[in-house]
């Protein structure tokens, strides 16, 4: 059994997209639950969470969490697309919760929303991911 102290703070999701042979970090998404916690219901129940993209973070914090996401993507040898979920504490410390190498790709999922904020439409995102997959054999 693995136990860890609960980390409380802001829920952030940072999508990393492989472009031109390297990682491109998309705008940060913040999930603000209507209730107290960002749990299963808050994640999947319509209207239970407000998504803010780009997240309302200062430039230093934005650069820090985007850099951490890119570093995790590279360290784990990821390709294509991944979503890095983090908690940002009130002290400004970022903790990675998970790195999802198969993130949701519906039009309401976090990665397509971040891509849209970066000027990459839903169809263009899917086309890019398919092209990347085809080049990998």
For the regions a language model picked out, list residue spans one by one.
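ATP-dependent carboxylate activation and anion-phosphoryl transfer catalytic cores
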Residues: 56-137
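Phosphate-binding site of ATP-dependent enzymes
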Residues: 3-67, 93-95
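Intrinsically disordered, low-complexity proline-rich regions
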Residues: 1-2, 125
């Amino acid at each position: 059994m693995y136990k860890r102290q609960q980390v409380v703070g802001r829920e952030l999701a940072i999508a990393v997209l492989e472009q031109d042979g390297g990682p491109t970090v998309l705008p940060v998404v913040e999930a603000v639950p209507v209730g107290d916690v960002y749990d299963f219901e808050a994640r999947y129940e319509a209207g239970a969470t407000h998504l803010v993209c780009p997240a309302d973070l200062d430039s230093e914090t934005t650069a820090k969490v985007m850099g951490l996401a890119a570093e995790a993507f590279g360290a784990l040898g990821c390709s294509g697309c991944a979503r890095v979920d983090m908690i940002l504490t009130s002290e400004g410390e970022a903790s990675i919760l998970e790195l999802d190498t198969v993130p949701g790709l519906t039009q309401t999922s976090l990665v397509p929303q971040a891509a849209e904020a970066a000027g990459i439409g839903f169809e263009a995102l899917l086309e890019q991911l398919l092209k990347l997959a085809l080049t990998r054999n």
